[in-house]
C-alpha cells in the first residue's frame, strides 16, 4: 500500500519488450537505496514489483493488462515518472491509502493555476463515475488528490 505522496521523480531509462510483458528500467536513486527484488514501488501510481536494483536504477515487468489500463504503455526512454516506495509498518502515514491498482485513465480538460494550488478539471471513463464521491480521494499518476466540486462527467480536482 502507498500514501499517494510522491517521494521522487524518476526517469525511464529503457523499455524492453518481453514475450507477454514489458520490462521497464527506471533511474531512481532515492527509492532504490533500500529496494530489493520483490519490493513494491508505485510508478505513476501503478504498483510494480522490483525485479532488479542496480546502481540507482530498478527494473520491473509490466503485464499487458496493466499497460492497457494505465499510461505505462506510452512511456519512452527519458519519460519522467512519479515514484513512491510501499508503506512500512510503523511509518507515519500522510496522504491517503492508495493500493496501486489502476482502474482507468482520465482526460485532462483544463488546468487553472492559483497562488498556492492548481485546479485540474478532467473527465473519467463513464464506468468509473459511480465510484467517485464529493470530497473523496483519487490517485492521479500516483498523487493522491481530493475532489472539490464534481459534476456529472467533469471532475474538478486540486
Feature locations, PLM:
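Intrinsically disordered, low-complexity, positively charged segments
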Residues: 2-39, 115
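Short, surface-exposed secondary-structure boundary micro-motifs
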Residues: 40, 46, 80, 84-87, ...
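Ordered, amphipathic secondary-structure segments that act as subunit-interaction surfaces
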Residues: 64, 68-105
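Short, Lys/Arg- and Gly-enriched loop/turn segments at beta-strand edges
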Residues: 49-53, 88-96, 146-149
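Single conserved hydrophobic/aromatic residue that forms the stacking wall/gate
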Residues: 147-158
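Intrinsic, low-complexity N-terminal interaction/targeting segments
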Residues: 22-23, 107-122, 126-137, 146-149
Amino acid at each position: 500500500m502507498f500514501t499517494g505522496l510522491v517521494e521522487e521523480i524518476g526517469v525511464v531509462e529503457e523499455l524492453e519488450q518481453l514475450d507477454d510483458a514489458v520490462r521497464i528500467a527506471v533511474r531512481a536513486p532515492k527509492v532504490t537505496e533500500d529496494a530489493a527484488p520483490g519490493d513494491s514501488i508505485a510508478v505513476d501510481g501503478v504498483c510494480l514489483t522490483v525485479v532488479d536494483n542496480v546502481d540507482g536504477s530498478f527494473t520491473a515487468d509490466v503485464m499487458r493488462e496493466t499497460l492497457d489500463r494505465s499510461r505505462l504503455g506510452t512511456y519512452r526512454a527519458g519519460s519522467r515518472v512519479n515514484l513512491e516506495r510501499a508503506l512500512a509498518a510503523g511509518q507515519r502515514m500522510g496522504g491517503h491509502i492508495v493500493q496501486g491498482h489502476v482502474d482507468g485513465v482520465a482526460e485532462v480538460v483544463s488546468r487553472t493555476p492559483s497562488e498556492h494550488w492548481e485546479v485540474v478539471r478532467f473527465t473519467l471513463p463513464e464506468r468509473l463515475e459511480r465510484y467517485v464521491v464529493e470530497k473523496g480521494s483519487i490517485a492521479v499518476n500516483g498523487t493522491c488528490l481530493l475532489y472539490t466540486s464534481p459534476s456529472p462527467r467533469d471532475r474538478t480536482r486540486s
